[in-house]
């Protein structure tokens, strides 16, 4: 895991704000339509000490593009490691593209009765999910322009067969940040805070597989070349973008980030 970084000593000050409006292009029913994104608050601060902006978020399996749009602009990511595991969420699944449209990749875990800390959730290797995931990825992205370049990194992590879901997701998140060439340090919580500090952007539960519209608070889809069909599928796992666009992935994620976080 990355080394811990010490934040610079500073005081956070509330300051006047102003609004800007962004116009974005969306593909709807095969047509490009222009929509106005929500107003974005820009912090117009008085000169003073620098305050690190922290993006607090839960850990996901091969996170979607909106995940990275949400944390883009922060100085650091803080992973919520003190939460309880929530079933049927992105914590153990992702969405990819295929010849049959969007499909999920679900990581089976060993279930326990009652509440289980996310760090204590074990992976279930009685099911051959790694081989199944890998075959599905090869079938879906084998012809993608950058699959052969990036796939070995993913293969190496999956086939390590680590014990815990959190550990797997941590390594995959680090891999994705490396692909984007983002030098954003990853930290972790040591207590669950209902009300985080004022310099913390609380993104916990902001990205919900069952409430996709929530993502549009900070994410608007930017179209890119995809492997299948003429209809663009938005907000898939970052691996879809990376396998299809390679080094351009970072600029596409940045362009999709609506809620610019100001230091």
What are these regions (language model features)?
Residues 5, 19-20, 35, 50:
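Short terminal hydrophobic/aromatic SLiMs and anchors at protein ends
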Residues 18-28:
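Short, composition-biased linear "edge" segments at structural boundaries
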Residues 30, 40-44, 48-263:
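Residues lining hydrophobic/aromatic ligand-binding pockets adjacent to catalytic sites
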């Amino acid at each position: 895991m990355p080394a811990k970084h010490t934040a610079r000593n500073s005081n956070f000050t509330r300051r006047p704000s102003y609004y800007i409006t962004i116009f974005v292009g969306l593909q709807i029913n095969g047509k490009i339509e222009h929509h106005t994104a929500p107003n974005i608050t820009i912090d117009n601060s008085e000169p003073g000490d620098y305050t690190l902006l922290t993006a607090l978020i839960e850990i996901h399996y091969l996170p979607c593009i909106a995940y990275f749009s949400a944390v883009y602009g922060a100085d650091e990511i803080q992973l919520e490691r003190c939460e309880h595991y929530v079933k049927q969420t992105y914590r153990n699944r992702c969405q990819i593209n295929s010849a049959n449209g969007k499909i999920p990749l679900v990581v089976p875990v060993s279930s326990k009765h009652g509440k289980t800390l996310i760090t204590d959730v074990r992976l279930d290797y009685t099911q051959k999910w790694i081989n199944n995931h890998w075959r599905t990825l090869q079938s879906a992205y084998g012809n993608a322009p950058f699959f052969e370049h990036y796939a070995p990194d993913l293969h190496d992590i999956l086939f390590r067969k680590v014990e815990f879901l959190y550990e797997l997701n941590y390594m995959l998140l680090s891999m994705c940040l490396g692909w984007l060439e983002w030098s954003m340090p990853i930290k972790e919580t040591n207590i669950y805070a209902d009300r985080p500090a004022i310099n913390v952007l609380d993104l916990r539960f902001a990205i919900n597989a069952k409430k996709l519209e929530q993502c549009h608070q900070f994410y608007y889809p930017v179209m890119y070349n995809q492997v299948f069909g003429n209809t663009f599928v938005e907000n898939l796992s970052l691996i879809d973008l990376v396998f299809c666009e390679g080094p351009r992935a970072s600029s596409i994620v940045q362009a999709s980030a609506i809620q610019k976080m100001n230091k």
